[in-house]
Amino acid sequence: RVVVSTDDAELADIAREYGAEVPFIRPAHLAEDTTATEPVIEHAIEFYTENGWEPEAVMLLQATSPVRLPGTLARAVRQFAENGKDSMVGVIPIGPFIWTWHADGEPTAAFEIMARPRRQELTKETFRYRENGSMYITKTHVYMDHHNRLAGYPGGTIDLFMLDEVEGVDIDAPIDFSVAEHQLTQILSEGK
């Protein structure tokens, strides 16, 4: 099932036109700029549970990460079904060359500077992975019991789902929108 939660009647109509379920208009208190995602998902779960259906898990697709290749969602569902984890998060690989700033103004490398590998030598274990907000799959009980999309509590399990680097855009600034638009145009023109 594809369910859209929105407070906008026009967006609801568009979602329905493309085959999504829009069983309710999201309440105003869950549609503010400061509203977290988890209460919105919990609202939808509660709606469906009260109406006789409780999903085993929820796949969250956020509009700010619109680039997904054909087959990605089916591959994600398959991996989640096979792995037995409580939650799964979409990630893209990034090199290990990450730096942080300390309060004293000094930078610190999150890698061994004197043993810096070439990018071509990196392995699955030496890459870092960036959560990009594109896709999460979470067992329903994690939302309802822990109010989180990831099972980071003691005993909870999380899996990583590798997205193609082209799927890694997260729209936070105007330039990100341009990048996403370009990537989607490219994907559609190539027929991927």
Model regions and ranges:
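A short acidic, often aromatic-flanked loop/helix-cap motif at beta-alpha or helix-coil junctions
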Residues: 29-33, 96-97, 166-169
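Short active-site oxyanion
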Residues: 1-3, 166-167
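Short phosphate-binding loop-to-helix
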Residues: 3, 9-59, 67-71, 75
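Catalytic donor-sugar/metal-binding loop of nucleotide-sugar-dependent glycosyltransferases
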Residues: 148-169, 174-178, 183-189
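Short beta-strand scaffold positions
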Residues: 4-6, 137, 171
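Short internal beta-strands
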Residues: 2-6, 90-91
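Conserved core of the sugar-phosphate nucleotidyltransferase
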Residues: 37-39, 43, 57, 65-154, ...
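A generic structural signal for short hydrophobic patches within well-formed alpha-helices
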Residues: 12, 142-144, 177
